[in-house]
Every structure is written in C-alpha cells, then in structure tokens.
Amino acid sequence: MQSIQAEFYHYRYLVLFSLCWFALNYAAALSFGAPLLIFADFVKYYSYVLMQYVALCAMALVYIALRALWRKQNAVKTVRQAVCQYVQEERYAALLPILIAMFGIFSCVSMSKSLVQYINPYQWDMYFYEMDIWLHGGVLPHEILLSLTPLNEFSTLMILKLSYMFWFFMMIIAYWYVIFIDGNRVHRDRFLWASSICWVILGGFSALYFSSVGPVFWHDF
C-alpha cells in the first residue's frame, strides 16, 4: 500500500493536470450554455477506469506467466510471487494513478469535442475539402483508393473502418509497454507527459479552433 501511495504522490501533478483539464471543460460548458448532459459521457467513460485497471493487471499477469513458460519456469509459482509483490513493485503500483489521470484526460478530450458546436461552430470543412482535392491532384482521396481495389465500395469502406480502429490497440500496446516492460521511470514520465500534452493541445484546443464535422457528416450540416 505504501508503494501505491508513493506512486500517487509521484504522479500528483499528472492527476492535477487531468483535474484542471476537466475544470476548464466544465467552466466552458457553463459559460457557453452547453447542456450538462454532455458530462454524462464523461461519467460513463470514466467509470470504466476500475475495469480497465483490472484488465491491464490481468494482461500483466498473463505476460509474466508467458515469460515464465518461455524460460521453462513454474508459471503458477511465478504469477503467485508477482501478485504478492504487486503493491511493492513500482511499475504495477503506478498503474492506478496513471489510469486515473490518463482516463480523465481522454474523457475530457471527448467532452471538449462535444463542446465545439457551442463554442466555435463548425466552419473548416470547406477548407479541408479543398485541401484534400489540391493534395490529391484534383480528386478526393477515397476516389483514388476505390479505383485501386478490386472490392466493392462497401467492402473497402468496412476494411478502412477496421483499419482505423487499429490505432486504439496500438495506443493500448504503447502504454502497456511503457508502464510494464520498459521499467525506466524517466522514459515513462516523459511519455505520459508528452502524450497528455498532445491529447490536450491536438485533441482539445486544435479540434476546437479547426472545428469541423468531417467529410462523412458534412452533408448533415
């Protein structure tokens, strides 16, 4: 337990950064008259913190068991020792404060995008549309892609949708590696702060300034 308390103290500024980002979104919602129902998504998303915490701990134990089997060791005994040492192992004890901070930031980024329509109504879609045409030689990028594949349009779009979702798994793997495998606190802190700042600036403020609904929903606006 002392190790977990020590990790909360170590990551206190990251947790505070997350709380400040939430407070800024809350103040913006009140100032611009946004419905407080927007915060329901935040509560729903943030309620998954404990579940994700348990899931990632389970992933860590699976990794430990597989590593033991690879080294021809007793996997059950190795996992039992890992569980006993959990609260003393700095990498694992750090997971709870990291999840609280990072999931707060992720939730607030999602919430800030819902506030765009109230703070800075969508206005950049035409510019992005013209930029796409200019960058791709006078045609839209999806037209080039559809001309290169033997599949029909629906199948191609489904493949693209699945490919797009792959970024989420890449992100989870990156965080999992930094927290559990790297073991270098300096690398971990640097990665967490860099990713947090990128989420807030690129996913929050940039999305607010360059407000656009995207090509899929543009016709609805």
Regions found by a protein language model. Name each.
Residues 1-221:
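Terminal transmembrane helix and immediately flanking juxtamembrane interfaces
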